[in-house]
Amino acid sequence: METLCLSHGTLLSLKTDDRLQIVDLTPRIEARVRSGPVRDGIALVMSMHTTLALFVNETQGALLDDVQTFLSELVPRARGWKHDDPALSDCDRRNADAHVKASLLGHNLAIPIQDGGLVLGTYQAILAAELDGPRQRSLHVQLIGS
């Protein structure tokens, strides 16, 4: 018996309200998976921006506050970044810290799909970390499988 491999891509829009903000994308990606053609496979989620990162964690408010505080302390905004220096860079956003934070977190995720739904642990959620907002953002969701 031959199994047909399907692939379906879609864009997901996201509007953020703060410079540093964590957004739970799980319900929106789950809806795309449930309405998509793939029953078993993988969902690839990719940020289309260098200052919007993706990660998996739980959505407990205090924990998300801790993550934001940790990122801000680990990679401070005012540090004399070369990317923020007009003599060295043509970037007018002065957002080097956001690029460095995103580099630490990553820009893509691979989540298993089984029986037409995402496979996540009890407390796991797909989270977007806005690191240079507020902005209008795009994510690409690619479903691959059968």
Predicted regions mapped to residue ranges:
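Active-site histidine-anchored catalytic micro-motif
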Residues: 1-146
